[in-house]
Amino acid sequence: MQERHTEQDYRALLIADTPIIDVRAPIEFEQGAMPAAINLPLMNNDERAAVGTCYKQQGSDAALALGHKLVAGEIRQQRMDAWRAACLQNPQGILCCARGGQRSHIVQSWLHAAGIDYPLVEGGYKALRQTTIQATIELAQKPIVLIGGCTGCGKTLLVQQQPNGVDLEGLARHRGSAFGRTLQPQLSQASFENLLAAEMLKTDARQNLRLWVLEDESRMIGSNHLPECLRERMTQAAIAVVEDPFEIRLERLNEEYFLRMHHDFTHAYGDEQGWQEYCEYLHHGLSAIKRRLGLQRYNELAARLDAALTTQLATGSTDSHLAWLVPLLKEYYDPMYRYQLEKKAEKVVFRGEWAEVAEWVKAR
């Protein structure tokens, strides 16, 4: 059985989206995992904790014996069935534990005894994690062009359409604003960084990449923060600013935050609960900036939001949301972005409407 153990092997594994059967405990997996990994643990959290305590108190032999005792009989058979099914479903996959130690070797030997030869990651998750960290540091050294612009200018779509674009918000599962959350929960910080590194590796491998196209983001995207090496490079990058008409921006925001989010919530939860989740999502977003709006203005806009939701529920129309969205943009979001842009005005190298910026970026 050929094991993966070189830096290039690790990178090739990530670029190919090689399925990884991660046999670490769920708590370890939740703290950080590779993008193509599925968690089929050798031991659950309680079993792992018991074995760890035994190791500290009685040594490795006693801990190993306890592990075999805990994962035996029906429990072992159930886990074997899950591993066997995963191996058959992912014949090009690979096993992984924390450091390429006993857990992945034990699972590998059990599978071998059952007639399945399956490789493992030498060095385990730790080696893969070091690879993603190093890859991000290296790839972030390439030139970067940032796409800037006020809310609703279609920056994310423009980035998505570039062959050298990386959608940071999509990877973070958050659109970066008070209303930015999606129905997908955000990943742990380590998992987000691993996903970002894998995406950068794949994008770089597809072409002779000269520069990155990224959205002009702050350090935080929801609960995830950008790796410091990338964030530092972004502060030095050139910026192309999208300046679309206000009416076009309103159309985009209506589609993205009202029509699409309502559809997504009702699709996920059903009509009744989905509507409640959608209402809560909008109210939570507005409440998040209450202090900056001031209590009086917040209460006024919250009342307009309630009225707009009542109208939307009765008629299906989202037009009434303009009564609170327009002042929110003009009084809060637009002035805030323009203030931020003024502080880095020397970095702005191009301004234009969406199509003009797209053409400019394409020519780089």
UniProtKB/Swiss-Prot annotation:
Its EC number is 2.9.1.3. SUPFAM superfamilies: Rhodanese/Cell cycle control phosphatase (SSF52821). CDD domains: RHOD_YbbB. Keywords: Selenium, Transferase. GO terms for molecular function: transferase activity, transferring alkyl or aryl (other than methyl) groups; tRNA 2-selenouridine synthase activity. Gene3D superfamilies: Rhodanese-like domain. The active site is at C97. The keyword Cell wall biogenesis/degradation does not apply. Pfam families: Rhodanese. HAMAP family: tRNA_sel_U_synth. Monomer. PANTHER family: TRNA 2-SELENOURIDINE SYNTHASE. Belongs to the SelU family. This is tRNA 2-selenouridine synthase.
